[in-house]
Amino acid sequence: QRSLVGSEMCIRDRVFYSAYMPVSNHRLLPAPQSFRPPLLREHRLYQADWLLRFYHFRAEELLDEANPNFNPLVDPKCSWALNHPEFFPVEVNRADYEALLRVPGIGVTSARRILVARRCAPLTFAGLKKLGVVLKRAQYFLTCGGKYLEGLRVSPDGVLRHLVAQERPMLAQGAPEQLSLFEQTG
């Protein structure tokens, strides 16, 4: 959590994270071949840092006493959304910029495009897709004209299962391996 607080203090500065990689064969350290670095945690730290710098989240919103660690199954923004059902659904035709940024599947560019496009006409889910919104994540947290995406029949408990199923191909590829500076490759 210190890393998150540190990156929040210097909004414009870039923070770099690195999983521990033993490089010595000293007997008091884990053997390099037996130790798998927590690369997924490193990835989640970068995602959280991005939320702090560009999406106006605060560190205590991402990690708290009830959720002291990142969910390894979904990204920090999806995890926040699942832990705050009272915030959703967000009505895309009335929500302000800050509310749009908290919806999984809506990024900074898409949120700005939504604000511009809805001045001309009410937005639909088809229109959101054209604006670059990732509906496979956003559909669970948005309404257009007070209605959910047609055909969406998912209970709140089922949302996590659906989001995990979408990320499963990435997680099922096996644990990523850190490239070595010392070994020659092919």
Question: Which role does the model predict for each range below?
Answer:
Residues D13-L39, Y55-H84:
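Flexible glycine/acidic-rich beta-alpha junction loops that bind and position SAM and/or redox cofactors
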Residues A117-R118:
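Residue-level signature of tetratricopeptide-repeat
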Residues Q1-G6, C10-I11:
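Single conserved hydrophobic/aromatic residue that forms the stacking wall/gate
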Residues N69-A99, F125-G186:
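C-terminal extensions
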Residues P37, R41-Q47:
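Anionic-ligand-binding alpha/beta catalytic cores of soluble enzymes and soluble regulatory domains
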Residues A48, I114:
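Conserved, mostly hydrophobic/aromatic
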